[in-house]
Every structure is written in C-alpha cells, then in structure tokens.
Amino acid sequence: MHAAYIRPGGVAKNISHTLFFDISVFVRQFFKRIDEIEDMLTCNRIWNVRLRDIGFVDYKQAFDYGFSGVMLRGSGIPWDLRLLDSYDNYNLLRFFIPVGTKGDCYDRYMIRVEEWGKVCLLLNKCCIVLDI
C-alpha cells in the first residue's frame, strides 16, 4: 500500500461496490477450485517426489536465518503478524495459524493450500465486518 493512500479519517478512495462484487465472484470461484487444485497436486507422484523431504529448515535455522511467513510456519513456528501484532482491523477477525511439522517443501506447500481456503473465508469476513 502506498503511503498516500491512508489519510486522516480513512483512505484516499473507499472500495467500490464494483470491486467488491468482482472480489466476491473471484473468491467464490477460487474457493470451489481449491479442492480440485489440491487433489491434482497433492496426489501427484512427481509433485510428491519433488517436495517431500526436500529443503528442510528446522525450528532453530528458521530463527537464526531470520525467516518469516511460510518459512517460519513450515518449521513449526506459529508466526503471523496479523494475529500477533494486530494492526488495522485484524483484531476483529478470528483465524488460526497453520503450521508444519517437518519443515520441508511439502509442509510449506500444504500450509499454502490451507491458507488459500482461509484467505477466502477472511475476505468474506472482511466484507461482513466492513459492511460492504
């Protein structure tokens, strides 16, 4: 977000109803496709061979290297700035932080798949909270 977007009392331009409609259409369509995408990739032998037991990052390494995001969560560290240092209106939303157990590429992939669904739900919640 650009610094000029946020203004005293709000933002430079509120979300339009057209954009809201486009977002809600996308979320509905994407949410329906998540299972299809997951089935296609998660059950794929080649995908599994290339992701499982590859690119291990353990708990200590994740901290030592200063990783963030899915790299931390894949190593078993439940870190999400939206929950831990609630800024904007994230304190009005309830969601949990998906974490991995092995710290490999497959864990990080599975976290991302889980986040796809959670993001769709969060977008719907945001629209309700913002009363759009």
Where are these regions (language model features)?
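Active-site bordering "gate/hinge" segments
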Residues: 1-132
